[in-house]
């Protein structure tokens, strides 16, 4: 349920963009992101850090988009989020005992620290790649193409890397048995 709540804003944004425009879609994104934080609080008695960070960034960049009537702000939001994710993973890679990915998944998955570090580094590079790709698409293609790619392209890329990561982890778990 939490995962569905976390991807819902992107699809609400897409629907409102298709029926209205980027400014109405940005407003809907702010509202649904806020509602998701409230739902997390009501059902789970907490707002996880990713949902809160997502809401705050959506609120900030979405408000700037609406206030200045300039879609560049909402386009930069995802780039900045991807850069932050990349940096957090990279910093955890080199300056902490456990990489961030390991902290999220180690309760459910038991593999060696070296494999966690490889996975963490790959995801860090992935987020950096997505940040650069977002800038490229935002500036060299139409707004409609950018919205479609934001929703379907990045989602597909993310699911693909999740699949590859899962296969890699499964291979490492099998070797450890």
Curated annotation (Swiss-Prot):
Protein name: Inner membrane-spanning protein YciB
Record keyword Membrane present: yes
Keywords: Cell inner membrane, Cell membrane, Membrane, Transmembrane, Transmembrane helix
Compartment(s) where it occurs, according to its Swiss-Prot or TrEMBL record: Cell inner membrane
Record InterPro entries: YciB (IPR006008)
Family: Belongs to the YciB family.
UniProt key word Thylakoid: no
Membrane-traversing stretches: 22-42, 50-70, 76-96, 121-141, 149-169
A Pfam short name: IspA
Chief localization: membrane
GO cellular component: plasma membrane
Species assigned in the record: Buchnera aphidicola subsp. Acyrthosiphon pisum (strain APS)
Domain of life: Bacteria
Task of the protein: Plays a role in cell envelope biogenesis, maintenance of cell envelope integrity and membrane homeostasis.
Topology versus the membrane: Multi-pass membrane protein
